[in-house]
From Swiss-Prot:
This is Interleukin-7. Belongs to the IL-7/IL-9 family. The gene is Il7. One of its GO terms (molecular function) is interleukin-7 receptor binding. GO terms for biological process: B cell proliferation; bone resorption; extrinsic apoptotic signaling pathway; homeostasis of number of cells within a tissue; immune response; interleukin-7-mediated signaling pathway; negative regulation of extrinsic apoptotic signaling pathway; negative regulation of extrinsic apoptotic signaling pathway in absence of ligand.
């Protein structure tokens, strides 16, 4: 008898707990029409893209960040939130004051627009050697994700 109740109590519930998502961040995109994106964020992303130069000498290998975090149909806002947090690491590059202003505009503006209520579960790892190739790819992915969101809302 004890064995049956043990299986009932401890057998099924752990399976349910395993199947539930570990963290559910509530993110709601505020401006789906894209006015704030087009008038502020897109301009700063383009400026940052110009400042970082060409990516012709960047390797084709995909960083772990992009393997773990993708802008798919259900997680656009969560991806943008993580990417915006990752951008803040590049303030340490100290390229120029203008670069830092645009970087903060994109990072803080994106976080404001995606409006995530829960805090991230762990700190973002330090980007190795302030990788300019990673920054260029991150900016491109942020821009692509915003464009995907805006096309889906039309």
């Amino acid at each position: 008898m004890f064995h049956v109740s043990f299986r009932y109590i401890f057998g099924i519930p752990p399976l349910i707990l395993v199947l539930l998502p570990v963290t559910s961040s509530e993110c709601h995109i505020k401006d789906k029409e894209g006015k704030a994106y087009e008038s502020v964020l897109m301009i700063s992303i383009d400026e940052l893209d110009k400042m970082t130069g060409t990516d012709s000498n960047c390797p084709n290998n995909e960083p772990n960040f992009f393997r773990k975090h993708v802008c798919d149909d259900t997680k656009e806002a969560a991806f943008l939130n993580r990417a915006a947090r990752k951008l803040k690491q590049f303030l340490k590059m100290n390229i120029s004051e203008e670069f830092n202003v645009h970087l903060l505009t994109v990072s803080q503006g994106t976080q404001t627009l995606v409006n995530c209520t829960s805090k991230e579960e762990k700190n973002v790892k330090e980007q190795k050697k302030n990788d300019a190739c990673f920054l260029k790819r991150l900016l491109r992915e942020i821009k692509t994700c915003w464009n995907k969101i805006l096309k889906g809302s039309i």
